[in-house]
Amino acid sequence: MQIDDALLQRLEKLSMLEIKDEHKESVKGHLAEVLGFVENIFALETSALKTDIELCTPLREDEPKSQPNTAKEILSQNKHSQDHYFVVPKIIE
């Protein structure tokens, strides 16, 4: 992939960055180098590789737990509570 002025301008807009004119050629060179590394990675043949680990996230059993005192403990930490709710200053009239 060739890094030209149009692509660099589009990348500037997408990233919301402004690259000064004196740095544009340097940035183009760095981007071309990075894309070269990515192309090398894509060229690797990995179909014959086998993984030593299982590539999935084990799920835990969903067990409901009753904790009836939790709400009381939380509300006891607040100075202003009423009818099992937090009382906060009114911000909208």
Curated annotation (Swiss-Prot):
First and last residue of the signal peptide: none
EC code: 6.3.5.-
Region (Disordered), start-end ranges: 60-80
One GO BP annotation of this record: regulation of translational fidelity
Enzyme class: ligase
Segments of skewed composition (Polar residues): 66-79
Pfam families per UniProt: GatC
GO molecular function: asparaginyl-tRNA synthase (glutamine-hydrolyzing) activity; ATP binding; glutaminyl-tRNA synthase (glutamine-hydrolyzing) activity
Catalytic activity: L-glutamyl-tRNA(Gln) + L-glutamine + ATP + H2O = L-glutaminyl-tRNA(Gln) + L-glutamate + ADP + phosphate + H(+); L-aspartyl-tRNA(Asn) + L-glutamine + ATP + H2O = L-asparaginyl-tRNA(Asn) + L-glutamate + ADP + phosphate + 2 H(+)
UniProtKB keywords: ATP-binding, Ligase, Nucleotide-binding, Protein biosynthesis
Gene3D superfamilies assigned: Glu-tRNAGln amidotransferase C subunit, N-terminal domain
General function of this protein: Allows the formation of correctly charged Asn-tRNA(Asn) or Gln-tRNA(Gln) through the transamidation of misacylated Asp-tRNA(Asn) or Glu-tRNA(Gln) in organisms which lack either or both of asparaginyl-tRNA or glutaminyl-tRNA synthetases. The reaction takes place in the presence of glutamine and ATP through an activated phospho-Asp-tRNA(Asn) or phospho-Glu-tRNA(Gln).
Subunit annotation: Heterotrimer of A, B and C subunits.
Protein family: Belongs to the GatC family.
Protein name as annotated: Glutamyl-tRNA(Gln) amidotransferase subunit C
Organism: Helicobacter pylori (strain ATCC 700392 / 26695)
